[in-house]
Curated annotation (Swiss-Prot):
Name of the featured protein: Uncharacterized 38.0 kDa protein in P143-LEF5 intergenic region
Record function comment: Plays a role in nucleocapsid assembly and is essential for viral replication. Distributed over the cylindrical capsid sheath of nucleocapsid.
Predominant subcellular localization, coarse grouping: virion
InterPro entries: DUF705, HAD-like_sf, HAD_sf, HAD_SF_ppase_IIIC
The UniProt record lists the keyword Cell membrane: no
Subunit details: Interacts with VP1054, VP39 and VP80.
Coiled coil: none
Keywords: Host cytoplasm, Host nucleus, Virion
GO-annotated cellular components: host cell cytoplasm; host cell nucleus; virion component
Length: 320
């Protein structure tokens, strides 16, 4: 839950950035010196907390490489920070949040967000699984897309049309289930959902006996040659787990963004979570809460329309 306390932020936009859309997050303006010669041109945006020093504004205004915007936003809300950067500079797309490896800032909004060390920006590849700048939609599986029955069924046949339309719109579709790899694989096969998702994430599970059809690689992925699927095991360390009073770990955008980056999706417009559990939502741009479905129910068109409307409203906002 975001704090109601507002902090002032200075966001700078570099006029002649070599690499566009990435955001460098600093503890203070003076930290720019740690980038070294000409490295500042790799970051179009720079953001840091405003310390109410009027002299600082004058110094920045005299640096003609940058234009400056000041805005207020909660210090623990990445969603608000991203929105304000986009709003201030009228850009619908951002790249990675980057930090100095030798002097990382300690802002709360950086929790549960994938942070790219500043020196890795130049090594990012341009080839991607998608053209243009996509919206990312993350779906839960159990009681969201499928039922809770022992023999699972699709929640609503309209789910297929919904996923197909989102795919045709250029969205990157991610499935993230806290179920075991076997459960996810077999459930998707049983309801014919295998071909719709660009990334499939499941909670890590221990294989009880050695199986010749499973091969695990160095990227925490298991390739199941019987099912012809590649599953990513969630082995990330969560930043906020120790700060929560319950045992529900949210579906951190950190993990999604990391695997998007692995597929060279380094820029996106918005990220949406579609899930029946509100506790899974943390720092997503949009959250679509669905009702549980122990058995099939024909209600998916309502949720589909909400997803689409959010995307359309987002696009319209930046056309104004």
């Amino acid at each position: 839950m975001a704090s109601s306390l507002q902090s002032k932020w200075i966001c700078l936009r570099l006029n002649d950035a070599i690499i566009k859309r990435h955001v460098l997050v600093l503890s203070e303006y003076a930290d720019l010196k740690y980038l070294g010669f000409e490295k500042y041109k790799f970051f179009e945006y720079v953001i840091f907390q405003f310390c109410n020093d009027p002299q600082l504004c004058k110094i920045i205004e005299n640096n003609y490489n940058y234009c400056m915007q000041i805005f207020k936003a909660p210090a623990d809300d990445m969603r608000d920070i991203r929105h304000n950067i986009k709003r201030a500079f009228k850009t619908p797309v951002l790249g990675h949040m980057c930090v100095l490896s030798n002097k990382p800032p300690m802002y709360s909004f950086l929790k549960e967000w994938f942070l790219l060390p500043h020196y890795k920006v130049v090594s990012l590849k341009s080839e991607s699984l998608t053209w243009g700048f996509p919206h990312v939609v993350v779906f839960d599986l159990d009681s969201t897309l499928i039922t809770e029955e022992e023999q699972v069924e699709i929640r609503d046949p309209f789910v297929y049309d919904s996923l197909q339309e989102l795919h045709e719109m250029g969205c990157v579709l991610v499935l993230w289930s806290y179920g075991s790899r076997d459960h996810v694989a077999h459930s998707m096969r049983d309801v014919d959902l295998e071909g719709y998702f660009d990334i499939i994430i499941s909670e890590g599970s221990t294989v009880q006996e050695e199986r010749s059809d499973l091969v695990q690689n160095s990227h925490n992925a298991i390739v199941d040659y019987n099912l012809k699927k590649r599953f990513i095991e969630n082995k990330f360390v969560f930043d906020i787990h120790n700060h929560r009073s319950d045992n529900n770990i949210p579906k951190s955008p950190k993990i999604v963004i990391k695997y998007l980056s692995d597929k060279n999706v380094n820029f996106f417009k918005s990220i949406t979570l579609v899930d029946d559990l509100p506790t899974n939502n943390y720092a997503y741009d949009f959250y679509v809460k669905v009702k549980r479905c122990p058995t099939p129910v024909q209600d998916w068109e309502h949720y589909h329309n909400e997803i689409i409307q959010n995307i359309m409203d987002y696009e319209q906002y930046f056309i104004k």
